[in-house]
Amino acid sequence: MKKLFATIVSLLTAAMLLAPATSMAQTKSRLAQILERGTLRVGTTGDFNPMSLRDTTNNTLVGFDIDAMKQLATDMGVKIEFVPTEWATLVNGLVSDRYDIFSGASLSMARAKTVAFSSPYTYVGTVPVTLKKDGAKFTDWASLNNANTTVAVSMGTVFEQQARALFPNAKVRAVEKPATGFQEVLAGRATATITSNIEASTLVKTYNTLQMIGTSATMKEARPLAYPVPQGDYVWLTFVNNWISLKQAEGFFDSLEAKWLTAK
C-alpha cells in the first residue's frame, strides 16, 4: 500500500513537470509547494473534542484529526506545522494562504462556496445516551419511544427539535442552561438524552456510567466530515482524496474511529 501511495506521488509530480512551462510559471500546485517547502501547514482550532483538542498536561494537540494530519504529513515525507485558527476564520485562513488544509469540518454549502472539500472521511450525527445499567432495556431508537421514558435536551437546540420529532410517544424535557441533558440522565431525572456522536463518545469516556446507543450506522441527521482545502487547485485536492481512499482501504480511519469515537 505504501508503494502504491509513493507511485501516486511520483505520477502527480511527473504530471506537474510535464505541464507547459508558462502554466507552471504562473501557478505552482500546492502539492509542489508543500513538497518543496518540506512542511504541511494544518489549520486547527484545538477545541473540537475529541477531533482536535489541546492536552493541558503537555500543551500538545491530540485527537482524531490531529492523528490523521500527522499521518498525512508522514506519508508525504514532510514535517507538520499546526496553525492556530478559529471556526469563524476557518475559510479566511485557507483563502489567505495561512495553511494548506484544515483539520476537518462538517461539509456545508455555505463553506463550499469559498473552499473545496475533500471526500468525506467520517460522519457526524445524532445518537442517544443513557445510563449503562439500562443497556438491556434500551438498545435502539425505537426502544426509547414510549410513554415511560423521558428524554432530556438543552432548550432551544437542534436536539430539542429532533427529540420532539423522533420521540412522539416519550416525554421530552427541555432544560435551561447551565443544566444539560446528560446531567439530567446522570441525576436520574431523565431516561436518555440525544447529542452528537462526537460529544457522546467523549461523555461515555468521561462518565463510565453512561453508554451511547447504536453506532455510526444508526445515528440520525448524519452529515459528512471532510478536509477543507483552497479552491481551484485540483492537483492538491486529488492528492488528498487519493490519500483518504488509500487510508480507508487500509483501515486507518476505522482505527481512528475505534480510538477516538467508539464507546468502550
Describe the role of every protein-language-model region.
Residues 25-105, 113:
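Extracytoplasmic small-molecule ligand-binding "clamshell" domains
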Residues 123-127, 201-245, 261-264:
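Periplasmic-binding protein-like
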Residues 52-58, 69-78, 140-141, 145, ...:
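Ligand-binding cleft/hinge of the Venus flytrap
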Residues 131-149:
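Flexible hinge/capping segments at coil-to-helix
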Residues 66, 81-92, 138, 173-187:
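Short helix-initiation/N-cap motifs at beta->coil->alpha
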